[in-house]
Amino acid sequence: MATSCFPPFSASSSSLCSSQFTPLLSCPRNTQICRKKRPVMASMHSENQKESNVCNRRSILFVGFSVLPLLNLRARALEGLSTDSQAQPQKEETEQTIQGSAGNPFVSLLNGLGVVGSGVLGSLYALARNEKAVSDATIESMKNKLKDKEDAFVSMKKQFESELLSEREDRNKLIRREGEERQALVNQLKSAKTTVISLGQELQNEKKLAEDLKFEIKGLQNDLMNTKEDKKKLQEELKEKLDLIQVLEEKITLLTTEIKDKEVSLRSNTSKLAEKESEVNSLSDMYQQSQDQLMNLTSEIKELKDEIQKRERELELKCVSEDNLNVQLNSLLLERDESKKELHAIQKEYSEFKSNSDEKVASDATLGEQEKRLHQLEEQLGTALSEASKNEVLIADLTREKENLRRMVDAELDNVNKLKQEIEVTQESLENSRSEVSDITVQLEQLRDLSSKLEREVSKLQMELEETRASLQRNIDETKHSSELLAAELTTTKELLKKTNEEMHTMSDELVAVSENRDSLQTELVNVYKKREHTRNELKQEKTIVRTLEEELKFLESQITREKELRKSLEDELEKATESLDEINRNVLALAEELELATSRNSSLEDEREVHRQSVSEQKQISQEAQENLEDAHSLVMKLGKERESLEKRAKKLEDEMAAAKGEILRLRSQINSVKAPVEDEEKVVAGEKEKVNVQQ
């Protein structure tokens, strides 16, 4: 591509290009970097000038590749100029001036290439400059880090050297101290040699003292064992007394709970009694109401009886009217039969009238009479129908009255059933009240028994409390005496310990004096060391024994303080027990008063119960009478119902007969109408013939 595009290039052109691009490379954008790299660049130019020419050629080729799209753009612009030559003369002039000034197209191309290459190289140079700046910054940071590490390494060296020096000094000091300690140990050995002989004699004396102390310790141990046994006995006695007190407290709590339960039961019984009184009052009210209702029912029954009598009378009158109606119906039926016979006769006469037209005039008179008779029959039928409608109205009224009476009787029966139920409820409530009163009496008897038992138990508890008080006071006196003895023994043991300590101090002083006077016994050091260790062990054992004795004494003192505290607590508990007993006595007195009140209430309740029994017996008698009256009324009502049913049957029969009569009347009317139509036609024919005869005349 490069050879085809640029064939005439030679060394002169390459020199021109190099002369044109040198100022671009020598632009003062990064003078420091150029200064740093001047010797490197000089060496490179001096070594290989051919490589620089090759680089220039390569740069020209790259610029040519980058300019190719610009040439295409210029060709497109020239095509646009050929199309718009008439509209843009000024642009052509400018192009001509540019072509005239250029003279040679290769020079213009080179200028364009130089401009484009300068832009590309400038951008590449800027990128390289930024990369160099970043690399310089990283190098400087690395140099700073290296300097810091070197400083840290130097400081570590100095610290290590100082530590080594200090360790050497410490080792020297330790060596000196060890030498001094060795010398001190040698001196101690020398002094120990002098003290060993004196220790032998002192050990013998100390053994004697230790044996004496052992005998004294054994005696003290025996005394301590005796005191421990006495203390155990006292503790057992205290436990027994505490158990007794707990048992008494439990009994007291049980008694208090029982008393509270009895109080609650008394309250509940009183509330139940109040409820029963209210129930009795309500029952008395119900009884009075039932009496009033019975009076009202008796009055209503009387009224019903009067109404029944009235209705019976009305029914008798209605039966009479029904008999009259039956008679009238029979008469109407007879008249109907006669009218039927007359109709048959009229039909026969009509047939004869047809056969005998000459006898029409005579038949007209008979027809008029028959018509009059028919009108009379129609009037009679109308009256019969009106009477039948009246009878129907009466029957409907009677049925309504019958239904009303049935409703009244049903309501009365419901009221009677309700009264029976109320009476049964009252009887059940009275029986329940009786059973509850009997239960209350049983409970009161139980309460009396419990109160007597409580009084007995309270008296027993008082006796037991007095005995426990006496025994506790004895135990307290014994514990006081034993504590005083223990305190005296403790004082004696403390004095003995002080004496032994003083003797030990004197012996130690004498041992020091003997150790200063005797320095010639070096050969017996080993034996003396053994003896000294043995004596040390014995002394340690004696010290441990003394410490145990002191600890036991402290423990005894603490036990004495505890026993004092227990004594105080027992005294407080005794005071509380006495207070609780006083409260129990008060509660017992209050319960006795409440029992007396309950007995009085029971007596009053029994009186009231007897009164209620009498009232209930009276109510039963009244209810029996009311039941008998109700049964009588029920029997009367049943009789009335049967009579009503018979009347209803009769009314139904009358209705059926009336319906049959209506049907027959309608048939008669239809027959009469059928007879009237041909008669009227014949009359019209006769009238027409008469008119014709008159016209002919």
Curated annotation (Swiss-Prot):
Phosphorylated in vitro by human casein kinase II. Residues 604-615 have a biased composition (Basic and acidic residues). Keywords: Chloroplast, Coiled coil, DNA-binding, Membrane, Nucleus, Plastid, Starch biosynthesis, Thylakoid, Transit peptide, Transmembrane, Transmembrane helix. GO terms for biological process: starch biosynthetic process. The keyword Thylakoid applies. It comes from the Eukaryota. It is found in: Plastid, Chloroplast; Plastid, Chloroplast thylakoid membrane; Plastid, Chloroplast stroma, Chloroplast nucleoid; Nucleus. Residues 616-627 have a biased composition (Polar residues). Interacts with MAF1. Interacts with PTST2; the interaction is essential for the initiation of starch granules biosynthesis in leaf chloroplasts, for the correct location of the process in the stromal spaces between the thylakoid membranes, and for the association of PTST2 with the thylakoid membranes. This is MAR-binding filament-like protein 1. It comes from Solanum lycopersicum.
